[in-house]
Amino acid sequence: GIGISNTPQECGKELTQMYESNVNDVLISCGGGELMCEILPYVDFDRIKAAKPKWYLGYSDNTNFTFLQNTIADTASVYGPCAGAFAMKDWHQALVDTFDVLRGKGCKNNNGVVEKQVHGYDTWERESLKNEENPAPQYNLTEKKILRKYVGGDECDTEIAFEGRLVGGCMDCLVNLTGTSFDKVK
């Protein structure tokens, strides 16, 4: 694993140990990447499943853990901003909402199941303004969100409501997990 913080074996061991640790309540990834898939054989998912549940926050390559935390350990995770995003001077509402979820703010407990209503945002960032001189810029929100709904392969214009656990992540990571020993989706 050139390009990750240690060998895949050590990274898997470290993730397992930090997840089991009693000195933290949440694990927040420093960033995405392309190599988290290499550590999966070295993450002890039996120990993760047996540990006290805690939040794991990250996006992109972190899907390799957030998705498996959901499907193998039956524990919620947050597919969202990595640690560096919280350095921006004025937090976008998405960062405020993420931080609120991690703290349990606005959540309700329904017979032991913690629930939080979620929503999207009107715009999104195609190109970040992040560079060496500006390591923590505001989001560069240039694109309008457009949602299309399909039922049975046909686009529909009626309102659709649903509830339940929202599970997902980075599509190329999800595709690469399909059919592996980590694929526990039923």
Report each predicted region and the residues it spans:
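Conserved anion/nucleotide-ligand pocket segment
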Residues: 76-172
